[in-house]
């Protein structure tokens, strides 16, 4: 099997919090979730994987590349949904998509339009006018529209209505 994510000896500390010597290996085709109480290190681990915070120690390899030296190439192959969004509030959904889509080597406009319709997301609405659930749906639409090789989702159902 092909390893898509490998973490060795990850250490990160903030004040009273310490993530110590985390080791993890994920094979292609597996579905894995982090479950634990608030403050257990789930989001810290995800932010470490995404090279959003500096590690105190350890290494992370994603899709065979070092997470630091291969950062841009790796991110072009990831479908990412973060709990805190990271969108430009004053842009419409369409303008945000037009800003994001060119960053990916592959963008599937048909998939994007299909997901926008399925999730009832109006392209002309500004991001600041979306509910938390609608923002999550939009983040999922973007993550699913560029044929990602690996998905990293931080609380992707937060704010979503139950089915």
Give the predicted meaning of each segment.
Residues 2-7, 12-163:
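ABC transporter nucleotide-binding domains
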């Amino acid at each position: 099997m092909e390893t898509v994510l490998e973490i060795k000896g990850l250490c990160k500390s903030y004040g009273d919090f310490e993530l110590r010597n985390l080791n993890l290996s994920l094979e292609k085709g597996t579905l894995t979730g982090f479950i634990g109480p608030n403050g257990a290190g789930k989001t810290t681990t995800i932010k470490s994987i995404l090279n959003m915070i500096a590690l105190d120690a350890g290494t992370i390899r994603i899709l065979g590349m070092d997470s630091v030296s291969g950062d841009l190439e790796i991110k072009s192959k990831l479908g990412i949904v973060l709990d805190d969004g990271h969108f430009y509030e004053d842009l419409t959904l369409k303008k945000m998509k037009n800003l994001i889509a060119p960053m990916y080597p592959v963008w599937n406009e048909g998939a994007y339009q299909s997901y926008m319709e399925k999730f009832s997301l109006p392209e002309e609405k500004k991001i600041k006018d979306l509910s938390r659930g609608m923002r999550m749906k939009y983040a999922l639409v973007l993550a699913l529209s560029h044929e990602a090789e690996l998905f990293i989702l931080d609380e992707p159902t937060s704010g979503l209505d139950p089915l």
